[in-house]
């Protein structure tokens, strides 16, 4: 006898609680909306590397194309070995993930979270964390950051319950760009049995990282990506650094072949091009200081490849609209939970792009 199920009833109830992820707007969309030529548009809304990928990575992509009919290694072992040299951690502490760090988050939630669990998310921050958590049945517990976007470890620990499985932290934080102090992270790790996940997507641009704590504690994992400093956002490649026990369980349930052959080859080449890596880092560090000094609004200090601009008393949407009409894509932060309506995130571009965005902010300030 057939059961009478509506199509909606086929979907897990938790899915309907998910707020769809809002990405940065594309060049094609803005060109079509505002009648602009695509080549005239400056895209500074998604924290991409304005220099593009390393030429070595591009060459590796081209050379990998004829082998697209062959499966890559199931666990991307060759890339994990290269990441071991890059990070200083044994291969047994490293996993590679596609699509990007998002795939790592999906995998961790899949092996850790059960229906009725909780995850803790200090906000505003990267909004993807709650998506895989909710999809797996967890309830996010949101903790408001301080006025300067720093964390209050005591508030986070007060929110920990027997149902808490993962605490999501971001350093440098997106969209604010500030680092998580090591002392605060230690305090959180040492006072919970939950997994503490540290998102270091932008860490190459920062003065320090927190990955060494993986050697000291068995309940901390670090996520990283090739999308930012390595300029491979379109290939969706990420990796995790975690205790050996967690690596083992992650690989047990991981999607095999999740890292495509082109992504694997490009990742290997990008890791080998230290000159290009340093060039990208220096461009971002110099550019963020220029933007902080020149943009005619309050700009927060940043350790990432972007800056956060407070345009109050103006509204971010109106200023963003003014910039879009001038062919400059930036990111209004109203899609970040509890970020408010006066913040705009601006990716560091080339020196020429940075000059144009500063001038556009100056004009928009008088127009809006």
Curated annotation (Swiss-Prot):
The modification N6-(pyridoxal phosphate)lysine is found at residue 228. Keywords: Amino-acid biosynthesis, Aminotransferase, Histidine biosynthesis, Pyridoxal phosphate, Transferase. The keyword Amino-acid biosynthesis applies. The keyword Magnesium does not apply. InterPro entries: Aminotransferase_I/II_large, HisP_aminotrans, PyrdxlP-dep_Trfase, PyrdxlP-dep_Trfase_major, PyrdxlP-dep_Trfase_small. One of its GO terms (biological process) is L-histidine biosynthetic process. It catalyses: L-histidinol phosphate + 2-oxoglutarate = 3-(imidazol-4-yl)-2-oxopropyl phosphate + L-glutamate. Its EC number is 2.6.1.9. Its cofactor is pyridoxal 5'-phosphate. Pathway: Amino-acid biosynthesis; L-histidine biosynthesis; L-histidine from 5-phospho-alpha-D-ribose 1-diphosphate: step 7/9. GO terms for molecular function: histidinol-phosphate transaminase activity; pyridoxal phosphate binding. It comes from the Archaea. Gene3D superfamilies: Aspartate Aminotransferase, domain 1, Type I PLP-dependent aspartate aminotransferase-like (Major domain). Pfam families: Aminotran_1_2. Belongs to the class-II pyridoxal-phosphate-dependent aminotransferase family. Histidinol-phosphate aminotransferase subfamily. This is Histidinol-phosphate aminotransferase. It comes from Methanosarcina mazei (strain ATCC BAA-159 / DSM 3647 / Goe1 / Go1 / JCM 11833 / OCM 88).
């Amino acid at each position: 006898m057939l059961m009478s199920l509506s199509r909606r009833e086929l979907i897990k109830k938790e899915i309907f609680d998910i707020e769809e992820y809002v990405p940065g707007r594309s060049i094609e969309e803005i060109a079509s909306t505002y009648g602009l030529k695509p080549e005239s548009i400056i895209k500074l809304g998604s924290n991409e590397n304005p220099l593009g990928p390393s030429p070595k990575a591009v060459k590796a992509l081209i050379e990998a194309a004829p082998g697209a009919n062959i499966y890559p290694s199931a666990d991307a072992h060759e890339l994990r070995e290269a990441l071991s040299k890059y990070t200083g951690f044994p291969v047994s502490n490293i996993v590679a993930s596609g699509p990007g760090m998002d795939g790592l988050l999906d995998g961790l939630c899949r092996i850790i979270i059960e229906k009725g669990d909780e995850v803790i998310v200090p906000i505003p921050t990267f909004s993807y964390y709650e998506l895989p958590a909710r999809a797996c049945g967890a309830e996010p517990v949101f903790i408001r950051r301080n006025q300067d976007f720093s964390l209050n470890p005591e508030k986070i620990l007060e929110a920990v319950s027997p149902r808490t499985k993962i605490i999501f932290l971001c350093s440098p934080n997106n969209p604010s760009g500030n680092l998580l102090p090591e002392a605060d992270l230690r305090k959180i790790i040492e006072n919970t049995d939950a997994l503490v996940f540290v998102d270091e997507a932008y860490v190459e641009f920062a003065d320090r990282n927190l990955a060494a704590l993986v050697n000291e504690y068995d309940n901390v994992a670090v996520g990283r990506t090739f999308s930012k400093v390595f300029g491979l956002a379109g290939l969706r490649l990420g990796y995790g650094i975690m205790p050996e026990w967690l690596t083992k369980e992650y690989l047990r349930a991981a999607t095999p072949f999740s890292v495509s052959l082109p992504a694997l080859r490009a990742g290997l080449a990008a890791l080998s091009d230290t000159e290009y890596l340093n060039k990208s880092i220096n461009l971002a560090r110099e550019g963020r200081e220029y933007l902080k000094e020149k943009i005619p609004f309050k700009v927060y200090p940043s350790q990432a490849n972007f800056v956060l601009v407070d345009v109050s008393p103006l509204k971010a949407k109106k200023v963003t609209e003014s910039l879009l009409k001038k062919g400059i894509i930036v990111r209004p932060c109203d899609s970040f939970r509890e970020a408010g309506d006066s913040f705009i995130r601006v990716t560091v571009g080339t020196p020429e792009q940075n000059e144009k965005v500063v001038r556009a902010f100056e004009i928009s300030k008088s127009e809006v």
